[in-house]
Amino acid sequence: MIAFVFPGQGSQKVGMGVELAEASAAAREVFGEVDEALSQNLAKLMAEGPESELTLTANAQPAIMANAMAVAKVLEEGGFHLAEKGDCVAGHSLGEYTALASVGAFSLTDTAKLLRTRGIAMQDAVPIGLGAMCALLGADLEKAQALADAAAQGQVCEVANDNDPTQVVLSGHMEAIDRAVELAKEHGIKRAIKLPV
């Protein structure tokens, strides 16, 4: 079985897509179409930053999708079509939208606009600097919930995603998430990583 899984938010970084754009006209076309759809030079933001702007949800989501779609187009340029060769496509959170676009369920333009709208809605729900997320590695749901309860201290700190039997994501107030990262080892959790969201 061949499966293609697309990344979710938190996988963005300044410099993403630069080598693809330099090496492939198909990748440049993807970045150009997304820029046009958003009336923004997102490709430049992806290439040069600043990181603080790229990490904003309204920018990060379409940027991650554009980068993944550029990879898909480079594969297609080489004769490897995901919709034909893959048995399935999937994505982690926002990657689900990329998966749909990669097999033609959504157009690239519509996906970029949808993710911009989704990103703005998510950003507006929690003002910048108020919320945060962390991934807990080596944590089951029970340990993650106990850590969230200990870290909350009157603030919000909740289990957000149960990714697999050994990885859970917490979200909540920034201070509570910072406490969770500090307390993780005391709760028998191998590692806690604050996510760039």
Where on the chain are the PLM-derived regions?
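Residues that mark the start of a beta-strand
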Residues: M1-I2, A132
